[in-house]
Amino acid sequence: MGYIPYVIENTDRGERSYDIYSRLLKDRIVLLSGEINDSVASSIVAQLLFLEAEDPEKDIGLYINSPGGVITSGLSIYDTMNFIRPDVSTICIGQAASMGAFLLSCGAKGKRFSLPHSRIMIHQPLGGAQGQASDIEIISNEIIRLKGLMNSILAQNSKQSLERIAKDTDRDFYMSALEAKEYGLIDKVLEKNVK
């Protein structure tokens, strides 16, 4: 990430400078931007856990603009979203592809949103393997297991059957925000912030 903007707040105790992400965190907004890897996932998980400790009853907003990334990294975010007590609302800004789309669909029911011109894409897990044939077989079996797990969760989160999810994720399956709503990955397309 390049330049990080700072904001200045005036309070009765004087001026306070925050990097923009810390300021958003004060409003219980977590930004998932870019490729999902272990480092990004650790940061997101830490922010979710921190916000739960601050107020276990108040919703958290997870804003997503991501092309996807490492499956296990994304699953650590998914598990944390389900583990913590606050509802996690998901909002797609720009794109939610692959693991980004998966996480978008995993927000609290009724609280999964997208901005109108965002793009959402689901597909099967990607992976590569090298080494001995037995090692490649082990990796292949793990990818197939993860594919089944993710398809099952997507089916639970959407209005689609497991068979339909398996068919649609066989290749890249792109949707507009409205199409993602009709598909059941999100609950509403947002035009304006109502806060």
Curated annotation (Swiss-Prot):
Q: Which domain of life is it from?
A: Bacteria
One Gene Ontology term, aspect cellular component: cytoplasm
Looking up InterPro entries in the UniProt record yields: ClpP, ClpP/crotonase-like_dom_sf, ClpP/TepA, ClpP_His_AS, ClpP_Ser_AS
Name the CDD domains for this protein.
S14_ClpP_2
Q: How far does the signal peptide extend, from start to end residue?
A: none
> What are its E.C. numbers?
3.4.21.92
**An example Gene Ontology molecular-function term:** ATP-dependent peptidase activity
Location(s), subcellular: Cytoplasm
Quickly give the catalysed reaction. Hydrolysis of proteins to small peptides in the presence of ATP and magnesium. alpha-casein is the usual test substrate. In the absence of ATP, only oligopeptides shorter than five residues are hydrolyzed (such as succinyl-Leu-Tyr-|-NHMec, and Leu-Tyr-Leu-|-Tyr-Trp, in which cleavage of the -Tyr-|-Leu- and -Tyr-|-Trp bonds also occurs)
Say which family it is in.
Answer: Belongs to the peptidase S14 family.
What the protein does comes down to: Cleaves peptides in various proteins in a process that requires ATP hydrolysis. Has a chymotrypsin-like activity. Plays a major role in the degradation of misfolded proteins.
Assembly with partners or alone = Fourteen ClpP subunits assemble into 2 heptameric rings which stack back to back to give a disk-like structure with a central cavity, resembling the structure of eukaryotic proteasomes.
Cite the NCBIfam families for this sequence: clpP, PRK00277.1, PRK12553.1
Name this polypeptide is given: ATP-dependent Clp protease proteolytic subunit
Q: Which gene encodes it?
A: clpP
